[in-house]
Amino acid sequence: MFKFFISSDAATEQTERFTRLNAHVPDLVRSVGVDVQGLDVQAMQQMNLISAECLFTPAAFAQALSHVSLWGNVAQHQTAAHVFAGNAVLCANFEAESTRILASLPQDWDFVLWGNTPGATLQLDILPDLALFTGAVQPPYSARGAAALSEMDVTSLAFPLMSTQSVCGYAISPSGADKLIKACLPLTSTTVPAANPHEGGAPAQTLEQLMSLHYSTIKAYACVPPLCMADAAVPAL
C-alpha cells in the first residue's frame, strides 16, 4: 500500500519534522496537496467540487481537496492507501501493526482510522449492535508530546467507527474512496451534530466533519489505542 502524507510547499519545517519523526516507516510519499493561494473556488464550484452554500475557509477548502484528490487516485488505480496529515506521528511498529490490523478485518473494509487529534471525541460500536463507546484520547502528558509515540510499540484493536470530527491518519480502500467521494462532494456546510448532543448542531466547516456523517453507513473502523497521533505543536498543513 502507498503511504502518503500531505504537506504544502510552504510547510518546509513541517515536512522536515514529519520525515524525521517518522523515519522508521518506509516508503512515505509526500503529497503536495492543493495550494491555498492558487485555489479558484469559482472554478471548483463549476466542477461540482464545492457548493455555493459551503462555508469552509480557503485553508479548509485546500485541506479537503488535498484529501479528495488522493481518494480519486485510490479509486482510479484500485489500490488501497494510507493517508496522513503533515503533523502526524506514527508509532514505532506502525508498519507491522497496521498490516496485522488490516489482515484481521473483513476483506471489504472501506476506511480505518489510525489516529486523530488528542482530545477529539470519537464514537465506536464497541459491542456491535449492543453498546456504543464515546470518548477521547487525551493530550500526551510526556514532555515530548506526541513525538514520543515514534519510539513506542503499540498493540491495537479495531472497532467499528461511528463518528469523529478529527482525522490524523487513515487507510482507505478503493470502495471506501468511491463511497466518501460520492458522500462528501460537492463540499457543503451540512449541519453536523455537536459532540455534546445537548448543544445541537452547526454547519460543517471541515471535510472531517462531513466524513463523520458517513462512517456509520460504510465499513469504517478505528484503532484503540491509536497507531498515530497529531502533533499539537505543528499545524496540519
What are these regions (language model features)?
Residues M1-F84, A88-L237:
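An acidic/histidine-cluster motif and surrounding catalytic segment
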